[in-house]
């Protein structure tokens, strides 16, 4: 799906770092929150596809009008931040982690 010039400009500025991204609709409402090991690769992947796994993703991409991101020190930090932002914004396109009864966890191994 072809991205608007505004979105293309955002994609060029995304870093190759872990973090969280927020997709906004034309009303400025957060419609999706996601995490990435590599923000540039992950966010760009939404706009470089010819086909999508499901209609939900296709509809989401059509509604994206702006993108913000937050760089995280690690992928684990991004996961925790993603969970908090999903609970804060309750984006319509996020299904997992949406209810307050789910808890992300990290296993520490030696």
Residue spans for each PLM region:
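Acidic, glycine-enriched active-site microenvironments
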Residues: 1-110
